[in-house]
Amino acid sequence: MIKIFVDSGSSIKQEEKELYNVEILPLKILLNNKEYSDGVDLSMDVFYKALIEDWQFPKTSLPSMEDTLERVSKCVEEGFDVLIITISSAISGTHNALKMLFKDNDKVRVVDSQSAVGGIKILVKEANKYLNETLDFVEEKLNALASRIIALAVPETLDYLRKGGRLGVTSWAVGTILKIKPVIALKNSVKVAGKVIGLKSAMKYLINALENCDVNYPIVPSYTFNLDNLTELISKTPKEYVGIMIEKDNLDPAIACHWGPNAFGYVFVQKKV
């Protein structure tokens, strides 16, 4: 029997653990010189006040290796095989750290989601179909699916991407002056998928991207802080796609800090080539 762990880069909330049948390893967040455990002792209100009103940019770091080792070892002692699905190794050191931590334990398998947030949720739903299979079998299934998952998001402002070091000064200045909306893609690494002028064009880009969506898997609608942009996007999206959407995902602080408030987007599985 397999027990599934994810890190909080999955944006699976503590109250959703039973829904997804997972255990959560919280990333660490340093905010105003205080360390928090993502999704555990940092409320959304405190986080967004710091981000919006105080213009404090949080720093994120790996889950506690000591706590992770203790929790995973306990599951192994109870007779479980353990599958850990991590945020993409291209944007966090979590995957490599956990691979090293459990490199000599054949009862533990660490899988790179190649994504984050909704992408991990999709992988968790898939993994839950195979809890009585071997770790080798499940890993192969997830790796194949992970390579097809893409997250597309539109930040309301470029300021947070700039402050987080993910956007150069020149690109930030030009984009801000021209009101350019970059559509950011997370598919293993973070890239600019497209550049459009204005919010309506950004929404049209996201909707058109769904033409390459594999409708056998869920779409995860995602946002930060304010639902308005996402609600408008969904209202413009064809019903065939709305019908396979799961619950709206208000991104956890560890991810939301890079996008800023009022970002929105879709996470989905692309069709096989």
Q: For each predicted feature, which ranges?
A:
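A generic structural signal for short
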Residues: 1-2, 36, 60, 86, ...
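Mixed-charge interfacial surface used for oligomerization/domain docking
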Residues: 3, 9-17, 22-23, 28-30, ...
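Class I S-adenosyl-L-methionine
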Residues: 35-104
